[in-house]
A protein has these predicted regions:
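Glycine-biased, small-residue-rich flexible motifs in mid-sequence functional cores and linkers
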Residues: 1-187
């Protein structure tokens, strides 16, 4: 189910995920990376969740870019409710809300990990911006690896206090980047 316009760009998108409780540095980096994606005409795919997801999507659409919000509920039930305005901006900026569930389906806990496979599957690459040891972002990274996607972490905040999960991904082979352009240089 889609609300809005699904971008016609194949897999040429970047999925960005992270903690719902980011540090100040994580917020700045999410806004920066989202804006960089907009400047490069690279749609941002994320879960419209509190924290890194919504900051990266906000950075993208505020810079004139396109974003896809993959929901763990129906497209007529934006969750969290605090992101209703962001969801409207995503739709009005030629992006969309996407869900595998009927339009008015409620958000239930078990649906969040399930939708992560869609977040990673829509893009060529996944950026785990900031993630603690136990994070849904790490579930998304596992899906990305299973799907043959490249996984990146953010070099600038790699050693931040809330980033043990991303640091673990880096130690397991994820590439650390400082900008979106670094992703293309690693291809």
């Amino acid at each position: 189910f889609v609300r809005g316009a699904l971008p016609d760009c194949g897999f040429n998108m970047l999925s960005i995920v992270g903690t719902r409780c980011p540090t100040g540095e994580g917020i700045k980096m999410a806004l920066k990376i989202g804006a960089e994606c907009a400047y490069l005409s690279l749609p941002v795919v994320s879960g419209l969740a509190r924290g890194i997801d919504s900051f990266s999507q906000r950075g993208c659409v505020e810079a004139g870019g396109v974003s896809i919000g993959v929901l763990a509920c129906g497209v007529e039930r934006v969750y969290p409710r605090t992101n209703i305005r962001l969801a409207s901006k995503i739709i009005s900026s030629c992006g969309c809300l996407l869900s595998e569930y009927p339009p008015f389906t409620e958000p239930l806990k078990f649906r969040f990990p399930q939708r992560n496979r869609i977040i990673s599957g829509l893009s060529k690459a996944l950026l785990v911006l900031e993630a603690p040891k136990k994070s849904g972002a790490l579930i998304t990274a596992d899906f990305a690896l299973e799907q043959g996607r490249d996984v990146f972490v953010c070099k600038d905040i790699l050693y931040s206090r809330k980033n043990e999960g991303a640091l673990s991904l880096y130690e397991d082979g994820a590439v650390a980047i400082s900008s979106v352009k670094d992703i293309f240089e690693n291809k």
